Structure formats: C-alpha cells, structure tokens
C-alpha cells in the first residue's frame, strides 16, 4: 500500500491518500488538544497508544456486528482504513452525567442516567460543535432520516458492547462520541476513532478519571491513565 499526499490534518490525526481509491491511512499524532483546539500539547507515546487502542476496540466492534472503517494496523502510529464520505454529525451516548450535560442542565456529575441519553452535535469547531436534533440534520442536508436511524442503532449497539467490555475491566463507560460515514457501497460505517480522547472512563471503585479529562482539567498523568486502561483491557502496546 503506497502512502501518498496528506488529505486532511485534524487536531490529533492526519489522513493520507493511498494508491487504492477506497483506502486511506490514518496517522495518530502525539498532539493533544482541548477546548476546540485552543490548547494543544505534545504527549509522548499518545499517538501509539491511541492507534493500538482504536484498533483493539474497532476489532471488538466488528466481531459484534458493527461495521467499522478499520482495516489493519500498519505500524505504531498508523492504520489502514476504508475511505468514507463523513457525515458532519457527532453521536454522543451518555450513561452517566458529565461534561457538557452537567453544564447545560445543572445536574450532578456522576449521576447514573436511566436509560442512557443519545445526543447529536454538529461537527464544527468554529461554531463550538453546537447541540442539534434530528430535524436539523435532515433540514440542512447533513444526513437523511434513514442514515440517522442507522447511526443511532449502531451507536446503541456500540454502547451495549463496550459498556460490558469496560465493566469487565473495572471501568465505567461514562459517555462517548462516535462519527459515521458512507462507504462506496452506500452503507453507514463507524469512522474516525474510539480512544480515551473521545470517551469518558472512570475507575468503577474510586471514580478516578482515566480519559482526556485528565488533560482538560490539569490532573496530570494523562498517558499513564491511557496505558492503564489499555493494560486492563489487554490491548497489546
């Protein structure tokens, strides 16, 4: 597989074309950002940890029947993925109150949500990733009602699979965000990544935060926490 020019550079990953029109290479960098990219730092080993963590999770999801863009690892910081036409909407599933939900509704952090909540946000850093609903997505042409229904179905399947996976490792899956795209055959496929950058994970007993909130809130030991989560899950680093 030949790596060609950079197609897109995000806050923590770069996307490269390949000699296959249906495949891309994702490069996980050590860049760590918060507050819509207003704060960026380099954290050693982060790209490697997130790349291998993502590969592990995506393979678990594929085995459970969730279609993902992941194909295979290419090295410590790179993986091969299917090329998707990304839908500019983030799907957020929350099992416990945290983050923007606490700020928005004034509820207590850590409150168990019964049942979970499913939310949509427009993927637009310049606008602060605003909270939206299904009718906005359809009205503005970001996606169809059928695509949204499939995205929600897959998001809830991911929650079912990963809540148990993390629970077995002594962790609470507090919340997470997912992004989806359309593959060349028209199917909806889970894209982007799943890592501690895009979810909240707390130790079940101590409620210690084991995710990017350690960076956002200045708690320190960010990569050490990521590596501990990986070790508990059995991710080969």
Curated annotation (Swiss-Prot):
Tell me the protein's name: Phosphoribosylaminoimidazole-succinocarboxamide synthase
User: Which reaction is catalysed here?
Assistant: 5-amino-1-(5-phospho-D-ribosyl)imidazole-4-carboxylate + L-aspartate + ATP = (2S)-2-[5-amino-1-(5-phospho-beta-D-ribosyl)imidazole-4-carboxamido]succinate + ADP + phosphate + 2 H(+)
A biological process (GO) annotation for this entry? Answer: 'de novo' IMP biosynthetic process
This protein's species is Pseudomonas fluorescens (strain ATCC BAA-477 / NRRL B-23932 / Pf-5)
One function term, GO molecular function aspect: phosphoribosylaminoimidazolesuccinocarboxamide synthase activity
Metabolic or biological pathway, per its Swiss-Prot or TrEMBL entry: Purine metabolism; IMP biosynthesis via de novo pathway; 5-amino-1-(5-phospho-D-ribosyl)imidazole-4-carboxamide from 5-amino-1-(5-phospho-D-ribosyl)imidazole-4-carboxylate: step 1/2
Similarity field: Belongs to the SAICAR synthetase family.
CC terms in the record's Gene Ontology section? cytosol
Query: What UniProt keywords are attached to this protein's entry?
Result: ATP-binding, Ligase, Nucleotide-binding, Purine biosynthesis
Write down the top EC class of this protein.
ligase
> Which CDD domains does the record associate with it?
SAICAR_synt_PurC
E.C. designation(s): 6.3.2.6
Family matches, as InterPro entries: SAICAR_synt/ADE2_N, SAICAR_synt_PurC, SAICAR_synth, SAICAR_synthetase, SAICAR_synthetase_CS
One Pfam family assigned to this protein is: SAICAR_synt
Give the signal peptide, or none: none
């Amino acid at each position: 597989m030949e790596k060609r020019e950079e197609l897109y550079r995000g806050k923590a990953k770069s996307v490269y074309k390949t000699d296959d029109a249906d495949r891309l290479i994702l490069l996980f960098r050590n860049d760590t950002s918060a507050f819509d990219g207003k704060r960026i730092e380099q954290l050693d080993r982060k790209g490697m940890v997130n790349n291998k963590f993502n590969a592990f999770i995506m393979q678990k999801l594929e085995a459970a029947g969730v279609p993902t863009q992941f194909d295979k690892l290419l090295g410590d910081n790179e993986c091969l993925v299917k090329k998707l036409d990304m839908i500019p909407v983030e799907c957020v599933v929350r099992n416990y109150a945290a983050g923007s939900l606490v700020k928005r509704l004034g509820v207590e952090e850590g409150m168990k949500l019964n049942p979970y909540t499913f939310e949509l946000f427009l993927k637009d850093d310049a606008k602060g990733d605003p909270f939206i609903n299904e009718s906005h997505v359809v009205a503005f042409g970001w996606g169809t009602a059928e695509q949204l229904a499939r995205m929600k179905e897959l998001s809830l399947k991911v929650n079912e699979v990963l809540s148990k996976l993390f629970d077995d490792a002594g962790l609470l899956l507090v919340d997470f965000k997912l992004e989806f795209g359309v593959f060349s055959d028209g199917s909806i496929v889970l894209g982007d990544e799943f890592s501690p950058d895009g979810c909240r994970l707390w130790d079940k007993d101590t409620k210690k935060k084991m995710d990017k909130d350690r960076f956002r809130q200045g708690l320190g030991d960010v990569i050490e926490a990521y590596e501990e989560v990986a070790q508990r899950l059995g991710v080969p680093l």
